[in-house]
Amino acid sequence: MDNKFLTRWVFSTNHKDIGTLYLVFGIGSGMIGTALSMLIRLELSAPGTMLGDDHLYNVIVTAHAFIMIFFLVMPVMIGGFGNWLVPLYIGAPDMAFPRLNNISFWLLPPALILLLGSAFVEQGVGTGWTVYPPLSAIQAHSGGAVDMAIFSLHLAGASSILGAMNFITTIFNMRAPGMTMDRLPLFVWSILITAFLLLLSLPVLAGAITMLLTDRNFNTTFFDPAGGGDPILFQHLFWFFGHPEVYILILPGFGMVSQIIPTFSAKNQIFGYLGMVYAMLSIGILGFIVWAHHMFTVGMDVDTRAYFTAATMIIAVPTGIKVFSWLATIYGGAVRLDTPMLWAIGFVFLFTIGGLTGVILANSSLDIVLHDTYYVVAHFHYVLSMGAIFAIFAGFYFWFGKITGYCYNELYGKIHFWIMFIGVNLTFFPQHFLGLAGFPRRYSDFVDGFAGWNLVSSLGSTISIVGVIWFVFIVYDAYVREIKFIGWVENTGASWSSLEWVQPSPPMSHTYNELPFVYGSYSALRPRNS
Protein backbone atom coordinates (compact mmCIF):
# COMPACT_ATOMS: atom_id res chain seq x y z
CA MET A 1 0.00 0.00 0.00
CA ASP A 2 1.79 3.12 -1.17
CA ASN A 3 1.96 6.41 0.66
CA LYS A 4 -0.24 8.23 -1.86
CA PHE A 5 -3.10 5.78 -1.24
CA LEU A 6 -2.80 6.22 2.54
CA THR A 7 -2.67 9.99 2.26
CA ARG A 8 -5.73 10.11 0.04
CA TRP A 9 -8.00 7.60 1.77
CA VAL A 10 -6.85 7.22 5.38
CA PHE A 11 -5.67 10.75 6.19
CA SER A 12 -8.17 12.41 3.87
CA THR A 13 -9.35 15.96 4.49
CA ASN A 14 -11.30 16.19 1.22
CA HIS A 15 -15.08 16.22 1.61
CA LYS A 16 -15.54 14.25 -1.63
CA ASP A 17 -13.17 11.44 -0.65
CA ILE A 18 -14.63 11.23 2.85
CA GLY A 19 -18.13 11.20 1.33
CA THR A 20 -17.05 8.29 -0.89
CA LEU A 21 -15.67 6.44 2.15
CA TYR A 22 -19.00 6.91 3.92
CA LEU A 23 -20.92 5.64 0.88
CA VAL A 24 -18.74 2.53 0.49
CA PHE A 25 -18.83 1.82 4.23
CA GLY A 26 -22.61 2.28 4.30
CA ILE A 27 -23.18 -0.05 1.36
CA GLY A 28 -20.91 -2.68 2.95
CA SER A 29 -22.75 -2.41 6.29
CA GLY A 30 -26.05 -2.54 4.43
CA MET A 31 -25.03 -5.90 2.95
CA ILE A 32 -24.45 -7.28 6.47
CA GLY A 33 -27.74 -5.80 7.70
CA THR A 34 -29.61 -7.25 4.74
CA ALA A 35 -28.08 -10.68 5.34
CA LEU A 36 -29.27 -10.51 8.96
CA SER A 37 -32.77 -9.53 7.84
CA MET A 38 -32.79 -12.54 5.52
CA LEU A 39 -31.91 -14.77 8.50
CA ILE A 40 -34.84 -13.28 10.41
CA ARG A 41 -37.24 -13.97 7.55
CA LEU A 42 -35.90 -17.52 7.10
CA GLU A 43 -36.52 -18.24 10.78
CA LEU A 44 -40.06 -16.85 10.44
CA SER A 45 -40.87 -18.50 7.11
CA ALA A 46 -42.53 -21.45 8.86
CA PRO A 47 -43.49 -22.50 12.40
CA GLY A 48 -40.81 -24.31 14.37
CA THR A 49 -37.22 -23.27 15.01
CA MET A 50 -34.55 -23.06 12.36
CA LEU A 51 -31.63 -21.08 13.79
CA GLY A 52 -31.70 -22.36 17.35
CA ASP A 53 -33.03 -20.63 20.44
CA ASP A 54 -34.96 -17.40 20.94
CA HIS A 55 -31.91 -15.62 22.26
CA LEU A 56 -29.90 -16.10 19.07
CA TYR A 57 -32.90 -14.83 17.09
CA ASN A 58 -33.02 -11.71 19.28
CA VAL A 59 -29.28 -11.15 18.83
CA ILE A 60 -29.81 -11.18 15.05
CA VAL A 61 -32.78 -8.79 15.29
CA THR A 62 -30.79 -6.40 17.50
CA ALA A 63 -27.75 -6.42 15.21
CA HIS A 64 -29.99 -5.95 12.15
CA ALA A 65 -31.58 -2.83 13.67
CA PHE A 66 -28.33 -1.23 14.87
CA ILE A 67 -26.51 -1.90 11.61
CA MET A 68 -29.31 -0.60 9.38
CA ILE A 69 -29.79 2.57 11.47
CA PHE A 70 -26.29 3.56 12.58
CA PHE A 71 -24.17 1.99 9.86
CA LEU A 72 -26.32 2.19 6.73
CA VAL A 73 -28.90 4.98 6.69
CA MET A 74 -27.01 7.59 8.71
CA PRO A 75 -23.56 7.15 7.10
CA VAL A 76 -24.99 7.07 3.57
CA MET A 77 -27.51 9.92 3.86
CA ILE A 78 -25.70 12.32 6.17
CA GLY A 79 -22.08 11.22 5.80
CA GLY A 80 -22.11 10.19 2.14
CA PHE A 81 -24.55 12.44 0.32
CA GLY A 82 -24.21 15.20 2.94
CA ASN A 83 -20.42 15.41 2.63
CA TRP A 84 -20.44 15.14 -1.12
CA LEU A 85 -23.21 17.60 -1.86
CA VAL A 86 -23.48 20.23 0.88
CA PRO A 87 -20.19 22.01 -0.01
CA LEU A 88 -21.01 21.76 -3.74
CA TYR A 89 -24.53 23.12 -3.18
CA ILE A 90 -23.51 26.14 -1.10
CA GLY A 91 -20.40 27.03 -3.10
CA ALA A 92 -17.94 26.13 -0.33
CA PRO A 93 -14.45 24.79 -1.11
CA ASP A 94 -14.80 22.07 1.56
CA MET A 95 -16.33 21.42 4.97
CA ALA A 96 -15.55 23.85 7.80
CA PHE A 97 -13.44 21.33 9.76
CA PRO A 98 -11.86 18.89 7.28
CA ARG A 99 -9.87 16.87 9.83
CA LEU A 100 -12.86 16.60 12.17
CA ASN A 101 -14.66 15.23 9.11
CA ASN A 102 -12.00 12.53 8.80
CA ILE A 103 -12.27 11.34 12.39
CA SER A 104 -16.07 11.42 12.14
CA PHE A 105 -15.75 8.73 9.51
CA TRP A 106 -12.98 6.70 11.14
CA LEU A 107 -14.94 6.35 14.39
CA LEU A 108 -17.50 4.25 12.49
CA PRO A 109 -15.50 1.13 11.45
CA PRO A 110 -14.36 0.47 15.06
CA ALA A 111 -17.96 1.00 16.20
CA LEU A 112 -19.17 -1.58 13.66
CA ILE A 113 -16.45 -4.03 14.70
CA LEU A 114 -17.45 -3.65 18.36
CA LEU A 115 -21.11 -4.23 17.51
CA LEU A 116 -20.39 -7.33 15.43
CA GLY A 117 -17.89 -8.50 18.05
CA SER A 118 -20.50 -8.28 20.79
CA ALA A 119 -22.34 -11.18 19.15
CA PHE A 120 -19.32 -13.44 19.83
CA VAL A 121 -18.96 -12.48 23.50
CA GLU A 122 -20.87 -14.77 25.89
CA GLN A 123 -24.36 -15.09 24.36
CA GLY A 124 -24.50 -11.78 22.45
CA VAL A 125 -26.86 -8.82 22.84
CA GLY A 126 -30.42 -10.15 22.75
CA THR A 127 -32.12 -6.99 24.00
CA GLY A 128 -33.62 -5.50 20.85
CA TRP A 129 -32.27 -2.14 19.67
CA THR A 130 -34.06 -0.38 22.55
CA VAL A 131 -31.73 -2.03 25.14
CA TYR A 132 -34.37 -1.78 27.89
CA PRO A 133 -33.30 -2.72 31.40
CA PRO A 134 -33.82 -5.03 33.29
CA LEU A 135 -33.24 -7.29 30.25
CA SER A 136 -30.04 -5.38 29.46
CA ALA A 137 -29.00 -5.29 33.14
CA ILE A 138 -26.21 -7.48 34.48
CA GLN A 139 -28.65 -10.08 35.92
CA ALA A 140 -30.20 -10.91 32.53
CA HIS A 141 -27.17 -10.25 30.29
CA SER A 142 -24.07 -11.22 32.23
CA GLY A 143 -20.76 -10.93 30.41
CA GLY A 144 -19.37 -8.18 28.24
CA ALA A 145 -21.66 -8.26 25.20
CA VAL A 146 -24.01 -5.42 26.19
CA ASP A 147 -21.02 -3.34 27.35
CA MET A 148 -19.44 -3.76 23.92
CA ALA A 149 -22.68 -2.71 22.24
CA ILE A 150 -22.87 0.35 24.52
CA PHE A 151 -19.31 1.31 23.62
CA SER A 152 -20.15 0.81 19.94
CA LEU A 153 -23.09 3.21 20.34
CA HIS A 154 -20.83 5.72 22.10
CA LEU A 155 -18.43 5.72 19.15
CA ALA A 156 -21.18 5.94 16.52
CA GLY A 157 -22.83 8.73 18.54
CA ALA A 158 -19.58 10.68 18.90
CA SER A 159 -19.08 10.35 15.14
CA SER A 160 -22.56 11.74 14.46
CA ILE A 161 -22.21 14.62 16.95
CA LEU A 162 -18.86 15.70 15.46
CA GLY A 163 -20.33 15.45 11.97
CA ALA A 164 -23.36 17.49 13.04
CA MET A 165 -21.16 20.27 14.45
CA ASN A 166 -19.23 20.27 11.18
CA PHE A 167 -22.36 20.55 9.01
CA ILE A 168 -23.90 23.31 11.14
CA THR A 169 -20.71 25.39 11.01
CA THR A 170 -20.27 24.77 7.28
CA ILE A 171 -23.82 25.71 6.32
CA PHE A 172 -23.93 28.83 8.52
CA ASN A 173 -20.45 30.15 7.76
CA MET A 174 -19.30 28.93 4.36
CA ARG A 175 -22.09 29.83 1.96
CA ALA A 176 -21.02 31.61 -1.22
CA PRO A 177 -21.83 35.34 -1.52
CA GLY A 178 -25.48 35.68 -2.50
CA MET A 179 -26.40 32.19 -1.22
CA THR A 180 -28.76 33.43 1.47
CA MET A 181 -30.63 31.01 3.73
CA ASP A 182 -33.81 31.44 1.69
CA ARG A 183 -31.94 30.29 -1.43
CA LEU A 184 -30.47 27.20 0.22
CA PRO A 185 -31.37 24.02 -1.69
CA LEU A 186 -33.83 21.88 0.29
CA PHE A 187 -31.28 19.08 0.66
CA VAL A 188 -28.95 21.47 2.49
CA TRP A 189 -31.83 22.59 4.71
CA SER A 190 -32.64 18.96 5.50
CA ILE A 191 -29.03 18.23 6.49
CA LEU A 192 -28.91 21.38 8.65
CA ILE A 193 -32.09 20.45 10.53
CA THR A 194 -30.90 16.84 10.87
CA ALA A 195 -27.59 18.08 12.31
CA PHE A 196 -29.43 20.06 14.99
CA LEU A 197 -31.56 17.02 15.85
CA LEU A 198 -28.40 14.91 16.21
CA LEU A 199 -26.71 17.53 18.35
CA LEU A 200 -29.67 17.77 20.73
CA SER A 201 -30.76 14.12 20.94
CA LEU A 202 -27.58 12.02 20.94
CA PRO A 203 -26.18 13.36 24.25
CA VAL A 204 -29.37 12.11 25.95
CA LEU A 205 -28.79 8.62 24.55
CA ALA A 206 -25.15 8.82 25.63
CA GLY A 207 -26.29 9.70 29.16
CA ALA A 208 -28.81 6.85 29.24
CA ILE A 209 -26.41 4.14 28.05
CA THR A 210 -23.65 5.45 30.34
CA MET A 211 -26.05 5.11 33.29
CA LEU A 212 -26.83 1.59 32.06
CA LEU A 213 -23.09 0.89 31.89
CA THR A 214 -22.59 1.98 35.51
CA ASP A 215 -25.67 -0.01 36.58
CA ARG A 216 -24.10 -3.08 34.99
CA ASN A 217 -20.54 -2.63 36.21
CA PHE A 218 -20.35 -0.27 39.19
CA ASN A 219 -23.43 -1.20 41.23
CA THR A 220 -25.36 2.02 40.66
CA THR A 221 -29.15 1.66 40.61
CA PHE A 222 -30.37 4.25 38.10
CA PHE A 223 -32.69 1.66 36.56
CA ASP A 224 -33.01 -0.81 39.45
CA PRO A 225 -36.07 -0.42 41.71
CA ALA A 226 -34.24 -2.29 44.49
CA GLY A 227 -31.99 0.73 44.90
CA GLY A 228 -34.60 3.40 44.27
CA GLY A 229 -34.15 3.54 40.50
CA ASP A 230 -36.77 3.25 37.78
CA PRO A 231 -36.50 1.22 34.56
CA ILE A 232 -39.10 3.55 33.01
CA LEU A 233 -36.58 6.40 33.31
CA PHE A 234 -34.43 4.57 30.78
CA GLN A 235 -37.36 4.35 28.39
CA HIS A 236 -37.97 8.09 28.67
CA LEU A 237 -34.29 8.89 28.06
CA PHE A 238 -33.98 6.39 25.24
CA TRP A 239 -37.08 7.54 23.37
CA PHE A 240 -36.21 11.20 23.85
CA PHE A 241 -33.31 10.28 21.60
CA GLY A 242 -35.12 7.54 19.68
CA HIS A 243 -37.94 9.59 18.29
CA PRO A 244 -35.82 12.47 16.91
CA GLU A 245 -33.61 9.69 15.55
CA VAL A 246 -36.34 8.41 13.24
CA TYR A 247 -36.68 11.95 11.83
CA ILE A 248 -32.88 12.10 11.50
CA LEU A 249 -33.20 8.98 9.32
CA ILE A 250 -35.95 10.38 7.06
CA LEU A 251 -35.28 14.15 6.81
CA PRO A 252 -32.26 13.89 4.46
CA GLY A 253 -34.46 11.60 2.36
CA PHE A 254 -37.05 14.39 2.18
CA GLY A 255 -34.27 16.71 1.03
CA MET A 256 -33.02 14.34 -1.66
CA VAL A 257 -36.51 13.68 -3.03
CA SER A 258 -37.13 17.45 -3.06
CA GLN A 259 -34.10 17.88 -5.34
CA ILE A 260 -35.00 15.00 -7.64
CA ILE A 261 -38.72 15.54 -8.29
CA PRO A 262 -38.45 19.05 -9.86
CA THR A 263 -35.61 17.90 -12.15
CA PHE A 264 -37.69 15.12 -13.72
CA SER A 265 -40.91 17.12 -13.81
CA ALA A 266 -39.15 19.78 -15.93
CA LYS A 267 -39.80 22.33 -13.17
CA ASN A 268 -37.33 25.00 -12.14
CA GLN A 269 -38.09 24.58 -8.48
CA ILE A 270 -40.11 22.67 -5.94
CA PHE A 271 -43.70 23.76 -5.29
CA GLY A 272 -43.86 25.90 -2.15
CA TYR A 273 -40.17 26.19 -1.28
CA LEU A 274 -40.70 28.20 1.90
CA GLY A 275 -43.52 25.92 3.04
CA MET A 276 -41.20 22.95 2.57
CA VAL A 277 -38.53 24.60 4.75
CA TYR A 278 -41.00 25.46 7.51
CA ALA A 279 -42.50 21.96 7.29
CA MET A 280 -39.07 20.41 7.89
CA LEU A 281 -38.39 22.82 10.76
CA SER A 282 -41.77 21.96 12.31
CA ILE A 283 -41.12 18.23 11.99
CA GLY A 284 -37.73 18.73 13.65
CA ILE A 285 -39.19 20.66 16.61
CA LEU A 286 -42.28 18.46 17.06
CA GLY A 287 -40.06 15.37 16.93
CA PHE A 288 -38.74 16.25 20.40
CA ILE A 289 -42.09 16.50 22.17
CA VAL A 290 -43.78 13.24 21.19
CA TRP A 291 -41.35 10.61 22.51
CA ALA A 292 -43.73 8.91 24.97
CA HIS A 293 -45.99 7.63 22.18
CA HIS A 294 -43.54 4.70 22.17
CA MET A 295 -44.50 4.04 25.79
CA PHE A 296 -48.32 4.05 25.83
CA THR A 297 -48.27 0.63 27.50
CA VAL A 298 -46.12 1.52 30.54
CA GLY A 299 -49.05 2.92 32.53
CA MET A 300 -49.03 6.69 32.04
CA ASP A 301 -51.86 8.99 33.14
CA VAL A 302 -54.76 9.26 30.74
CA ASP A 303 -54.14 13.01 30.26
CA THR A 304 -50.46 12.35 29.47
CA ARG A 305 -51.54 9.80 26.87
CA ALA A 306 -54.05 12.28 25.43
CA TYR A 307 -51.32 14.91 25.05
CA PHE A 308 -48.89 12.55 23.31
CA THR A 309 -51.64 11.29 21.01
CA ALA A 310 -52.57 14.84 19.97
CA ALA A 311 -48.97 16.04 19.60
CA THR A 312 -48.08 13.00 17.48
CA MET A 313 -50.99 13.63 15.14
CA ILE A 314 -49.91 17.25 14.65
CA ILE A 315 -46.71 15.94 13.00
CA ALA A 316 -48.94 14.63 10.21
CA VAL A 317 -49.70 18.25 9.20
CA PRO A 318 -46.19 19.37 8.09
CA THR A 319 -45.63 15.89 6.65
CA GLY A 320 -48.81 16.30 4.60
CA ILE A 321 -47.61 19.71 3.40
CA LYS A 322 -44.47 18.02 2.10
CA VAL A 323 -46.32 15.17 0.38
CA PHE A 324 -48.79 17.50 -1.34
CA SER A 325 -46.02 19.89 -2.38
CA TRP A 326 -44.19 17.00 -4.05
CA LEU A 327 -47.41 16.03 -5.82
CA ALA A 328 -48.02 19.66 -6.82
CA THR A 329 -44.49 19.80 -8.26
CA ILE A 330 -45.18 16.74 -10.40
CA TYR A 331 -48.61 18.05 -11.44
CA GLY A 332 -48.59 19.67 -14.88
CA GLY A 333 -44.92 18.88 -15.43
CA ALA A 334 -43.42 17.02 -18.38
CA VAL A 335 -42.66 14.04 -16.16
CA ARG A 336 -39.79 11.78 -17.26
CA LEU A 337 -39.80 8.42 -15.51
CA ASP A 338 -36.05 7.92 -15.36
CA THR A 339 -34.76 5.67 -12.59
CA PRO A 340 -34.26 8.37 -9.91
CA MET A 341 -37.80 9.65 -10.52
CA LEU A 342 -39.23 6.14 -10.14
CA TRP A 343 -37.56 5.80 -6.75
CA ALA A 344 -38.74 9.28 -5.74
CA ILE A 345 -42.36 8.59 -6.72
CA GLY A 346 -42.15 5.21 -4.98
CA PHE A 347 -40.84 7.04 -1.92
CA VAL A 348 -43.75 9.49 -1.85
CA PHE A 349 -46.35 6.76 -2.30
CA LEU A 350 -44.97 4.23 0.19
CA PHE A 351 -43.85 6.80 2.75
CA THR A 352 -47.45 8.07 2.75
CA ILE A 353 -48.75 4.56 3.53
CA GLY A 354 -46.23 4.31 6.37
CA GLY A 355 -47.39 7.71 7.61
CA LEU A 356 -51.04 6.62 7.61
CA THR A 357 -50.33 3.58 9.79
CA GLY A 358 -48.33 5.96 12.00
CA VAL A 359 -51.43 8.11 12.53
CA ILE A 360 -53.34 4.97 13.49
CA LEU A 361 -50.65 3.99 16.01
CA ALA A 362 -50.65 7.53 17.44
CA ASN A 363 -54.02 6.78 19.10
CA SER A 364 -53.07 5.60 22.57
CA SER A 365 -56.11 3.34 22.92
CA LEU A 366 -55.40 1.58 19.61
CA ASP A 367 -51.68 1.46 20.31
CA ILE A 368 -52.24 -0.43 23.57
CA VAL A 369 -53.66 -3.25 21.44
CA LEU A 370 -51.14 -2.94 18.58
CA HIS A 371 -48.01 -2.21 20.65
CA ASP A 372 -45.26 -4.81 20.11
CA THR A 373 -47.15 -6.53 17.30
CA TYR A 374 -46.08 -6.80 13.69
CA TYR A 375 -48.34 -3.84 12.87
CA VAL A 376 -45.67 -1.60 14.38
CA VAL A 377 -42.94 -3.47 12.47
CA ALA A 378 -44.87 -2.97 9.23
CA HIS A 379 -45.35 0.73 10.02
CA PHE A 380 -41.72 1.63 10.59
CA HIS A 381 -40.45 -0.59 7.80
CA TYR A 382 -42.73 1.19 5.36
CA VAL A 383 -41.19 4.46 6.56
CA LEU A 384 -37.60 3.17 6.65
CA SER A 385 -37.31 0.27 4.21
CA MET A 386 -39.44 2.10 1.63
CA GLY A 387 -38.86 5.67 2.78
CA ALA A 388 -35.22 6.04 3.76
CA ILE A 389 -33.91 3.24 1.51
CA PHE A 390 -35.94 4.34 -1.53
CA ALA A 391 -34.66 7.89 -1.00
CA ILE A 392 -31.09 6.57 -0.79
CA PHE A 393 -31.52 4.68 -4.07
CA ALA A 394 -33.15 7.74 -5.69
CA GLY A 395 -30.18 9.85 -4.60
CA PHE A 396 -27.70 7.18 -5.63
CA TYR A 397 -29.04 6.94 -9.18
CA PHE A 398 -29.49 10.72 -9.40
CA TRP A 399 -25.95 11.63 -8.33
CA PHE A 400 -24.16 8.45 -9.47
CA GLY A 401 -23.03 10.15 -12.67
CA LYS A 402 -22.06 13.32 -10.82
CA ILE A 403 -19.95 11.39 -8.30
CA THR A 404 -18.36 8.74 -10.57
CA GLY A 405 -18.54 10.37 -14.00
CA TYR A 406 -20.08 7.17 -15.43
CA CYS A 407 -23.59 6.28 -16.61
CA TYR A 408 -25.41 3.31 -15.16
CA ASN A 409 -27.62 1.30 -17.52
CA GLU A 410 -31.04 2.97 -17.41
CA LEU A 411 -32.96 -0.25 -18.16
CA TYR A 412 -31.07 -2.12 -15.43
CA GLY A 413 -31.88 0.68 -12.99
CA LYS A 414 -35.60 0.42 -13.75
CA ILE A 415 -35.49 -3.37 -13.35
CA HIS A 416 -33.81 -2.82 -9.97
CA PHE A 417 -36.62 -0.48 -8.93
CA TRP A 418 -39.38 -2.92 -9.84
CA ILE A 419 -37.67 -5.90 -8.18
CA MET A 420 -37.27 -3.91 -4.96
CA PHE A 421 -40.75 -2.38 -5.17
CA ILE A 422 -42.39 -5.80 -5.44
CA GLY A 423 -40.04 -7.34 -2.88
CA VAL A 424 -40.44 -4.83 -0.07
CA ASN A 425 -44.21 -4.52 -0.49
CA LEU A 426 -44.63 -8.29 -0.49
CA THR A 427 -42.45 -8.42 2.62
CA PHE A 428 -44.09 -5.74 4.71
CA PHE A 429 -47.70 -5.37 3.57
CA PRO A 430 -48.78 -8.78 4.98
CA GLN A 431 -47.24 -7.81 8.32
CA HIS A 432 -50.13 -5.37 8.83
CA PHE A 433 -52.50 -8.36 8.74
CA LEU A 434 -50.27 -10.34 11.11
CA GLY A 435 -50.21 -7.43 13.54
CA LEU A 436 -53.97 -6.96 13.47
CA ALA A 437 -54.29 -10.70 14.15
CA GLY A 438 -52.10 -10.23 17.20
CA PHE A 439 -48.75 -11.67 16.08
CA PRO A 440 -46.19 -10.32 18.61
CA ARG A 441 -42.74 -8.95 17.74
CA ARG A 442 -39.41 -10.47 18.77
CA TYR A 443 -40.60 -14.10 18.83
CA SER A 444 -38.82 -16.70 16.73
CA ASP A 445 -41.64 -19.24 16.76
CA PHE A 446 -45.39 -18.95 16.29
CA VAL A 447 -48.64 -20.90 16.10
CA ASP A 448 -49.70 -22.33 12.74
CA GLY A 449 -52.41 -19.72 12.21
CA PHE A 450 -49.76 -17.10 11.41
CA ALA A 451 -47.89 -19.32 8.95
CA GLY A 452 -49.53 -18.13 5.71
CA TRP A 453 -48.72 -14.42 5.79
CA ASN A 454 -45.30 -15.11 7.31
CA LEU A 455 -44.45 -17.30 4.34
CA VAL A 456 -45.60 -14.57 1.91
CA SER A 457 -43.49 -12.05 3.84
CA SER A 458 -40.42 -14.29 3.66
CA LEU A 459 -40.90 -14.79 -0.09
CA GLY A 460 -40.94 -11.00 -0.47
CA SER A 461 -37.64 -10.69 1.38
CA THR A 462 -36.09 -13.24 -0.98
CA ILE A 463 -37.13 -11.03 -3.91
CA SER A 464 -35.56 -8.01 -2.19
CA ILE A 465 -32.28 -9.91 -1.81
CA VAL A 466 -32.28 -10.53 -5.58
CA GLY A 467 -32.75 -6.76 -5.99
CA VAL A 468 -29.75 -6.01 -3.78
CA ILE A 469 -27.52 -8.40 -5.75
CA TRP A 470 -28.79 -6.85 -8.99
CA PHE A 471 -27.87 -3.41 -7.62
CA VAL A 472 -24.29 -4.54 -7.01
CA PHE A 473 -24.18 -5.78 -10.60
CA ILE A 474 -25.47 -2.39 -11.88
CA VAL A 475 -22.61 -0.56 -10.15
CA TYR A 476 -20.09 -3.11 -11.47
CA ASP A 477 -21.57 -2.79 -14.97
CA ALA A 478 -21.32 1.03 -14.92
CA TYR A 479 -17.64 0.90 -13.95
CA VAL A 480 -16.87 -1.72 -16.60
CA ARG A 481 -18.64 0.01 -19.49
CA GLU A 482 -17.26 3.46 -18.55
CA ILE A 483 -19.84 5.45 -20.52
CA LYS A 484 -19.33 9.14 -19.78
CA PHE A 485 -22.10 10.87 -17.83
CA ILE A 486 -23.26 14.14 -19.43
CA GLY A 487 -25.91 15.33 -16.99
CA TRP A 488 -29.60 15.17 -16.17
CA VAL A 489 -30.19 18.88 -16.52
CA GLU A 490 -29.56 19.01 -20.26
CA ASN A 491 -31.87 16.03 -20.78
CA THR A 492 -34.81 17.11 -18.65
CA GLY A 493 -35.31 20.70 -19.76
CA ALA A 494 -35.03 22.08 -16.23
CA SER A 495 -32.67 25.01 -15.79
CA TRP A 496 -29.78 24.75 -13.36
CA SER A 497 -31.69 24.92 -10.14
CA SER A 498 -28.60 24.18 -8.09
CA LEU A 499 -24.87 24.72 -8.18
CA GLU A 500 -23.64 21.13 -8.24
CA TRP A 501 -24.56 20.66 -11.93
CA VAL A 502 -22.29 23.58 -12.87
CA GLN A 503 -19.30 21.38 -11.97
CA PRO A 504 -17.90 18.75 -14.35
CA SER A 505 -18.73 15.08 -13.64
CA PRO A 506 -16.92 13.88 -11.63
CA PRO A 507 -16.00 17.23 -10.05
CA MET A 508 -12.37 18.22 -9.61
CA SER A 509 -10.73 17.21 -6.35
CA HIS A 510 -10.88 20.86 -5.27
CA THR A 511 -13.91 22.83 -6.38
CA TYR A 512 -14.57 26.57 -6.05
CA ASN A 513 -11.00 27.82 -5.99
CA GLU A 514 -12.71 31.12 -6.70
CA LEU A 515 -15.93 31.75 -4.77
CA PRO A 516 -18.99 31.76 -7.02
CA PHE A 517 -21.46 34.61 -6.72
CA VAL A 518 -25.06 33.45 -6.60
CA TYR A 519 -27.83 35.71 -7.85
CA GLY A 520 -31.48 35.43 -8.86
CA SER A 521 -34.22 33.64 -6.98
CA TYR A 522 -33.94 30.09 -5.64
CA SER A 523 -35.44 28.90 -8.90
CA ALA A 524 -32.55 29.98 -11.10
CA LEU A 525 -29.28 29.92 -9.19
CA ARG A 526 -26.34 30.55 -11.45
CA PRO A 527 -22.74 31.47 -10.83
CA ARG A 528 -22.02 34.91 -12.27
CA ASN A 529 -19.71 33.66 -15.04
CA SER A 530 -22.07 31.12 -16.67
Swiss-Prot record:
Ca(2+) binds at residues 43, 46, 48. There is a cross-link at residues 243-247 (1'-histidyl-3'-tyrosine (His-Tyr)). GO terms for molecular function: cytochrome-c oxidase activity; heme binding; metal ion binding. Fe(II)-heme a binds at residues 64, 381. Its EC number is 7.1.1.9. Its main location: mitochondrion. O2 binds at residue 247. It is found in: Mitochondrion inner membrane. The chain crosses the membrane at residues 20-40, 59-79, 105-125, 148-168, 186-206, 237-257, 270-290, 313-333, 341-361, 380-400, 417-437, 455-475. Heme a3 binds at residue 379. Its cofactor is heme; Cu cation. Cu cation binds at residues 243, 293-294. It is an enzyme of class 7 (translocase). GO terms for biological process: electron transport coupled proton transport; mitochondrial electron transport, cytochrome c to oxygen. Component of the cytochrome c oxidase, the last enzyme in the mitochondrial electron transport chain which drives oxidative phosphorylation. The respiratory chain contains 3 multisubunit complexes succinate dehydrogenase (complex II, CII), ubiquinol-cytochrome c oxidoreductase (cytochrome b-c1 complex, complex III, CIII) and cytochrome c oxidase (complex IV, CIV), that cooperate to transfer electrons derived from NADH and succinate to molecular oxygen, creating an electrochemical gradient over the inner membrane that drives transmembrane transport and the ATP synthase. Belongs to the heme-copper respiratory oxidase family. Component of the cytochrome c oxidase (complex IV, CIV), a multisubunit enzyme composed of a catalytic core of 3 subunits and several supernumerary subunits. The complex exists as a monomer or a dimer and forms supercomplexes (SCs) in the inner mitochondrial membrane with ubiquinol-cytochrome c oxidoreductase (cytochrome b-c1 complex, complex III, CIII). This is Cytochrome c oxidase subunit 1. It comes from Metridium senile (Brown sea anemone). The gene is COI.
